[in-house]
């Protein structure tokens, strides 16, 4: 509009710029609040393939406030260490050649969880040997010491210490997986007087292509084979693993209902809780990894609700859903999520 016309109408250009307090909500043409709300998130501080945000306690405190605002009550440290990088000054792991961290992140997360009335799940140590060799014996051996050390140092000190995450990830009935999960799960429960444990495997679907340079694959697992293999796994671990949160990003959106129905049926059969790990990053992009398009997240959460899942957690809030993420799109996703779930 020409300046003379603006002046003639007695208007100032600033009137056309909305402040955040006056921002107009999106006019959704789908039903609102029709999915399973995210109530838990992983904390990806030992980053494997995502850039580190270099936050201090001030930034983490603010992020916990953002989490609390949308109803997150559970935070899960995805791993307490990966190869030589660790999250707390573990005497055992330092003795094995790991690097000394500058901050005790386990203590910080437990304090923040206590401050904001959340439960903290401790993720076990990842040696890296399993990814190199597919041999799980290293994970069992190292975590024998880590589990005891962590419980003695933090478990009895903080009421926010709410459970354990067995961080080894599988998708199929990998050799030795049942025994390894059972051993680690049992030790976690024994040492902590029965605190809950969970796993978060991936579904070996068409998007399970890490390391191949491709976007999809042809030899994806069928729903029937997935059911057979996970029936066997659950049969062997259900007495020491309380919940299973399948990652939801490796299958296509029109496959969600079929796989989710099977997952819930198996969990119910073995008395386990069925969670979804709703990935808030986008596997359909050639760039690893950026915040997901809102409609993709919406469809996944709606499928989880249709299947009757017990809880939705995400990987992960701080990079892909937080208003203070290094990715600008994450804050916009936070806004779209709040609009959809009618969170003020």
What spans do the regions from the language model cover?
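N-terminal twin-arginine translocation
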Residues: 2-22
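Glycan-processing catalytic domains of CAZymes
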Residues: 16-344
């Amino acid at each position: 509009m020409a300046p003379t016309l603006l002046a003639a109408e007695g208007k100032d250009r600033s009137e056309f710029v909305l402040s955040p307090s006056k921002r107009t909500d999106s006019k959704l043409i789908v039903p609102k609040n029709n999915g399973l709300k995210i109530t838990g998130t992983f904390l990806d501080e030992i980053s494997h393939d995502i850039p580190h945000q270099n936050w201090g306690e001030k930034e983490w405190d603010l992020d916990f406030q953002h989490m609390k605002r949308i109803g997150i009550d559970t935070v899960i440290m995805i791993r307490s260490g990966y190869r030589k990088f660790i999250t707390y000054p573990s005497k055992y792991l330092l003795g094995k050649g790991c690097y000394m961290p500058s901050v005790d992140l386990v203590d910080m997360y437990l304090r923040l969880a206590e401050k904001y009335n959340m439960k903290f799940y401790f993720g076990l140590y990842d040696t890296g040997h399993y990814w190199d060799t597919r041999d799980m014996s290293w994970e069992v051996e190292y975590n024998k010491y880590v589990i005891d050390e962590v419980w003695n140092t933090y478990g009895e000190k903080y009421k926010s210490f709410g459970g354990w995450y067995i961080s080894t990830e599988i998708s199929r009935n990998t050799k030795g997986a049942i025994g390894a999960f059972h051993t680690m799960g049992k030790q976690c429960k024994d040492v902590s007087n029965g605190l809950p444990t969970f796993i978060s495997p991936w579904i070996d679907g068409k998007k399970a292509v890490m390391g191949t340079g491709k976007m999809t694959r042809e030899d994806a697992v069928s729903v029937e084979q997935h059911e057979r293999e996970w029936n066997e796994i659950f049969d062997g671990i259900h007495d020491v693993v309380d919940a299973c949160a399948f990652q939801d990003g490796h299958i296509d959106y029109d496959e969600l209902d079929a796989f989710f129905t099977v997952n819930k049926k198996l969990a119910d059969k073995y008395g386990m809780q069925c969670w979804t790990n709703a990935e808030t990053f986008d596997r359909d992009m050639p760039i690893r990894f950026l915040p997901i398009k809102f409609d993709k997240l919406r469809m996944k959460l709606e499928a989880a609700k249709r299947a009757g899942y017990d809880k939705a957690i995400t990987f992960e809030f701080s990079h892909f859903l937080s208003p203070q993420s290094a990715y600008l799109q994450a804050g916009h996703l936070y806004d779209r999520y709040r609009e959809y779930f009618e969170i003020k």
